[in-house]
Amino acid sequence: MEQKRNDSIDFAKGFLMIFVILGHIVQGTIEDGNLRGVIYSFHMPLFLFISGYMINLNKLIAQPVKDVFSKYWNRMLKAWLLAYVIFTSYLLLREPTIISVIGLTYSPWGHLWYVPTLFLYILLCKFLFGKTNLIVSYSVLILLGIAWNYVIQTTSINVSHWFDCSKLPYFALGLYFRNHLNSEKFNKPYIVAPLLYVPLYFAFVSLPFKTFGLGTALLLVGVIILYFYPALKNDTMPKSKVLSYIGKNSLYVYLWHQAPILLLVNYVSECNLTYYYIISFALLFLFILYIKLRKVA
């Protein structure tokens, strides 16, 4: 019997995808504490929580590495590679310098970090949970996230984003909620509390939006525990055909939404920021209207 699709996961991904787009449209730095900073404080952490929540560890561990590569090549890596080549080529054509070549080789541009990072998270979890016990596996994920954030916070090292472990705690949290929340040994409060709070604290205090501090971290984990996780598990999130459609196609929306924004930033915002916002939000409105008018929506 075919398992019913969880519409709440699609809704959540679509909802967060709108904020991903808004976060890239809004100009300014995250440190300014403006709307962009608020958006960045929750949209990618929750996206990574969902990504971890969608992983079935037993199936992942049982699959040969070759099959894992094949599965994710068709599911996301092939589409990502095309986007990476096109965006990188465009950026190098605009600035054909050796510094640009080195920079874009060392670390992918903008939003292109997510897919390779997610794939490496998955491979790491396959190895850890397949070779070690739960305590060791989760400890490694947490400590790796903490160590990565410590380096970012205390040194001037420009860490590559091909494998960005700074957000690993959120992925691990989703993984835990999906696969081990009902495990007796992990339901003990003195084990669960550090798993939930400590990694998120270290993640928040070292990221660009660290000014939101511990309060934001605890607020976000509270939202996850009290609403986000129960709503995903019980499929009780609001129904929206438009957001669900965006959620189902979130990979392609994520990979290509930056194309018009990048062109507008390069050719419009430098001349007239008002025109930039008018065109950007008009395009976003037309995108949503197009989905609304489609029969599949």
Named regions from a protein language model:
Residues Q153, I157, D164, N182-S244, ...:
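Alpha-helical transmembrane segments and terminal signal-anchor/GPI-anchor hydrophobic tails
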Residues E31, R94-Y106, Y121-F129, N149-S156, ...:
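Short juxtamembrane and helix-loop transition motifs at transmembrane-helix boundaries
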Residues I122-L144, Y176-P194, N272-Y275:
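Solvent-exposed interhelical
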Residues D10-I21, K78-I86, Y138-L144, V192-V198, ...:
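Alpha-helical transmembrane segments
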Residues R294-A297:
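Membrane-proximal cytoplasmic C-terminal regulatory module of class A 7TM GPCRs
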